[in-house]
Amino acid sequence: MVSEQFNAAAEKVKSLTKRPSDDEFLQLYALFKQASVGDNDTAKPGLLDLKGKAKWEAWNKQKGKSSEAAQQEYITFVEGLVAKYA
């Protein structure tokens, strides 16, 4: 059930009429990656890759969170974005 809601939430993000902030996008990215991949075990990007480094750090902050917990948090976060930006 949570997986279906997670997939539906991922689709809702695509239909937002206004662009969320960069911080909100990073949070979405981190929760999505934690829910779908698990803990970040990739190499940290170099100093000059600012975007990649920000995404890596956001995902790394989710380390230890279960897939189901990350999915539920993602769903709740998307609901807030829909209320704010739809």
Swiss-Prot record:
Tissue/organ expression: Expressed in larval and pupal brains. In adults, expressed in cardia, part of the Malpighian tubules, fat body, and gametes of both sexes.
Keyword field: Lipid-binding, Transport
GO annotation, biological process: fatty acid metabolic process; intracellular acyl-CoA homeostasis
Binding site for an acyl-CoA: K14, Y29, A30, L31, F32, K33, K51, K55, Y74
MF GO annotations: fatty-acyl-CoA binding
Alphabetical list of InterPro entries matching this protein: Acyl-CoA-binding_prot_CS (IPR022408), Acyl-CoA-binding_protein (IPR000582), Acyl-CoA-binding_sf (IPR035984), FERM/acyl-CoA-bd_prot_sf (IPR014352)
ACB domain mapped to chain residues: 2-86
SUPFAM superfamilies: Acyl-CoA binding protein
Any Pfam family matching the protein: ACBP
Role noted for this protein: Binds medium- and long-chain acyl-CoA esters with very high affinity and may function as an intracellular carrier of acyl-CoA esters. May be involved in energy metabolism in a manner that depends on the substrate used for energy production. Dbi and its metabolites are involved in the regulation of multiple biological processes.
Family listed: Belongs to the ACBP family.
Protein name (record): Acyl-CoA-binding protein homolog
Source species of the chain: Drosophila melanogaster (Fruit fly)
The gene coding this protein: Acbp2
